[in-house]
């Protein structure tokens, strides 16, 4: 038996009426859900996803010597933040996010710390990694449609003062033919208190934009966080089509001594080299999608969204308009247009045959 109560909910009917019917095994290379244990739960003939907060993980990250009561407080605060942020987004008419539908706390006896806060979400069909086929052109329309959904979701969050910060393939959830953003746990909200608000970046560092890797931070909260989301959206486009993130492409083209894990200079000093690596990464991406219809349009979006310097990131027309650099409306329209063009091409090709 695991000493953590969060790992031992299987078979239990919780006080809120949810019966925990299956434990979800974390994938070997997964980088998410560090602080939680995931289950499938059912209630009233409805099957949902349950996220249990794991005290042992909070204790592990807090280090030795920290009072147990303080660690419990941190865990409870993280639980309340994600729950309340979900409510905040729903009130702001956000639709492209997987929301909390129930929550509670369970106490299990015979454990050193028996309290287990949990959140219940609508059950997705899976994350986007299970759906993508990197060599199937017929899947191209679906990819554009999914990216369109995600761009809408990011814009909706921005409209209510929220930055997702952790946009990556495992956090894109598939519901039938609709894609939604998952896991707001690391998001930042301008109007809500969170431990992450003191950070420059709160997402997965494997996907972080280059300015964060080189420890450069814009002072303005909106510029810093929204620029990050723009980069992550562009990186997601790269992943959808090549199966690799933009950060991995950038790293591939940076000389060893200039990579962020070795660099000891300033962001200003590394800019010329970063720009060269970016140009090479874009070229590789463009070559990699040469077989795709509309590849030039797609590459242009990635160029703009993933530009290595945040002040020049975004659509050129938006950059010229003060305060609108990171407005995603043009990209939402573009993705919708590209999807329709791709659908039309498939229709015409079928008619020819």
Model-derived features: where do they sit?
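Structural motif in protein kinase domains
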Residues: 123-133
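ATP-binding glycine-rich loop module of kinase domains
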Residues: 36-88
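Short beta-strand micro-motifs within the conserved protein kinase catalytic domain, predominantly
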Residues: 97-117
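Catalytic-loop of the protein kinase fold
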Residues: 157-174
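Conserved C-lobe activation region of Hanks-type protein kinase-like domains
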Residues: 216, 221-228, 235-289
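Juxta-kinase regulatory segment immediately upstream of eukaryotic protein kinase catalytic domains
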Residues: 1-28
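Activation segment signature within eukaryotic-like protein kinase domains
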Residues: 146-147
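Activation segment/activation loop of eukaryotic-type protein kinase catalytic domains
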Residues: 170, 175-206
């Amino acid at each position: 038996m695991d000493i953590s109560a969060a790992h031992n909910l299987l078979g239990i009917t919780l006080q809120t009426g949810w019966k925990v019917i299956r434990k979800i095994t974390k994938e070997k290379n997964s980088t998410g859900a560090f602080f939680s244990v995931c289950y499938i739960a059912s209630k009233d003939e409805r099957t949902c996803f349950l996220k249990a907060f794991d005290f042992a993980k909070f204790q592990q990250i807090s280090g030795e010597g920290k009072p147990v009561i303080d660690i419990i407080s941190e865990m409870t605060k993280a639980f309340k933040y994600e729950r309340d942020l979900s409510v905040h987004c729903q009130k702001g008419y956000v639709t492209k996010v997987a929301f909390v539908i129930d929550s509670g706390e369970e106490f299990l006896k015979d454990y050193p710390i028996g309290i287990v806060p949990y959140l219940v979400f609508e059950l997705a069909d899976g994350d986007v990694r299970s759906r993508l086929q990197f060599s199937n052109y017929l899947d191209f329309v679906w990819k554009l449609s999914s990216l369109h959904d995600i761009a809408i979701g990011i814009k909706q969050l921005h409209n209510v003062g929220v930055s997702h910060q952790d946009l990556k393939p495992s956090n894109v959830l598939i519901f039938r033919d609709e894609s939604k953003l998952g896991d707001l746990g690391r998001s930042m909200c301008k109007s809500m208190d969170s431990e992450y608000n003191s950070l420059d970046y709160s997402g997965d560092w494997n996907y972080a934009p280059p300015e964060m890797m080189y420890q450069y931070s814009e002072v303005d909260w909106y510029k810093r966080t929204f620029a990050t989301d723009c980069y992550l959206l562009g990186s997601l486009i790269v992943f959808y089509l090549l199966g690799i993130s933009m950060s991995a492409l950038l790293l591939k083209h940076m000389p060893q001594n200039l990579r962020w894990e070795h660099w000891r200079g300033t962001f200003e000093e590394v800019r010329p080299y970063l720009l060269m690596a970016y140009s090479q990464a874009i070229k590789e991406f463009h070559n990699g999608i040469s077989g795709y219809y509309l590849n030039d349009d797609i590459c242009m979006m990635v160029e703009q969204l993933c530009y290595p310097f945040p002040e020049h990131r975004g659509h050129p027309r938006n950059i010229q308009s003060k305060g609108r650099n990171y407005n995603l409306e043009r990209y939402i329209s573009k993705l919708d247009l590209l999807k329709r063009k791709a659908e039309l091409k498939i229709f015409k090709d079928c008619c020819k045959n």
